[in-house]
């Protein structure tokens, strides 16, 4: 790392959510540039690759407090390191998954999640054809065994992929059992205590946005 390049992390809770959503895009792009042999990268270079204004990129990167060289930019290796650390990708966060349907099963088979710091160590369902089996080496237990498994695993994150009708019920069970953060893939807005972290990722909502923009473009 260059001597005149300073890296210092700040309180992540002060970072706007839109910035947190963009930082992984920058990280992925910088990794691609590294594969191409680039040693330094500027906000302008990243801007051209991902079509985000260079001033916005520079502002976003200011939250992780990394300063580059004048007329040269950021050192690629240093930028990758600080972004991965800032985003929590350098540590493994263990998680339980609830609901081994099509989406849940796909997440269990997504080995790429571990590269971003998330390891699903067990899954829960009530389907007798699934309970007692494993998928991608991940054991599937009955939902009734959740509390017992919480004693065996060091888990704070729950991934919610159950039917919408039981989303709140399963969420309550998770929170009562000690889960501190919920990655919610259902279209239901779950209710949790203030100290519980919730990240809503509704595929249907993203579809609605895409369809709306597609229709708008067609009638222009």
From Swiss-Prot:
Organism: Bacteroides thetaiotaomicron (strain ATCC 29148 / DSM 2079 / JCM 5827 / CCUG 10774 / NCTC 10582 / VPI-5482 / E50)
Record flagged with keyword Transcription: yes
Protein name, per record: Redox-sensing transcriptional repressor Rex
Molecular function (Gene Ontology), one example: DNA binding
GO biological process: negative regulation of DNA-templated transcription; response to redox state
PANTHER family (UniProt xref): REDOX-SENSING TRANSCRIPTIONAL REPRESSOR REX, REDOX-SENSING TRANSCRIPTIONAL REPRESSOR REX 1
Positions in coiled-coil regions: none
DNA-binding region(s), chain positions: 25-64
Subunit structure: Homodimer.
Pfam families: CoA_binding, Put_DNA-bind_N
Binding site for NAD(+): 99-104
Family: Belongs to the transcriptional regulatory Rex family.
Gene, per the UniProt record: rex
Keywords linked to the UniProt accession: Cytoplasm, DNA-binding, NAD, Repressor, Transcription, Transcription regulation
GO cellular component: cytoplasm
């Amino acid at each position: 790392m260059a001597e005149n390049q300073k890296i210092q992390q700040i309180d992540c809770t002060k970072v706007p959510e839109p910035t947190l959503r963009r930082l992984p895009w920058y990280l992925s792009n910088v990794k691609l540039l590294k594969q191409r042999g680039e040693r330094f990268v500027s906000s302008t270079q990243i801007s051209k690759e991902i079509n985000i204004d260079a001033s916005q990129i520079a502002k976003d990167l200011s939250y992780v407090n990394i300063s580059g060289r004048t007329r040269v930019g950021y050192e690629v290796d240093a930028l990758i390191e600080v972004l991965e650390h800032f985003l929590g990708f350098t540590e493994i966060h263990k998680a339980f998954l609830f609901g081994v349907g099509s989406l849940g099963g796909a997440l269990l088979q997504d080995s790429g999640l571990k590269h971003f710091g998330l390891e699903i160590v067990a899954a829960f369902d009530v389907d007798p054809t699934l309970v007692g089996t494993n998928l991608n080496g991940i054991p599937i237990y009955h939902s009734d065994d959740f509390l017992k498994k919480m004693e065996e695993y060091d888990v704070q994150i729950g991934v919610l992929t159950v039917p919408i009708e039981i989303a709140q019920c399963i969420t309550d069970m998770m929170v009562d059992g000690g889960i501190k953060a919920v990655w919610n893939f259902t279209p239901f807005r779950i209710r949790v205590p203030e100290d519980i972290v919730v990240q809503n990722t509704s595929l249907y909502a993203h579809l609605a946005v895409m369809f709306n923009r597609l229709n708008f473009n067609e009638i222009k």
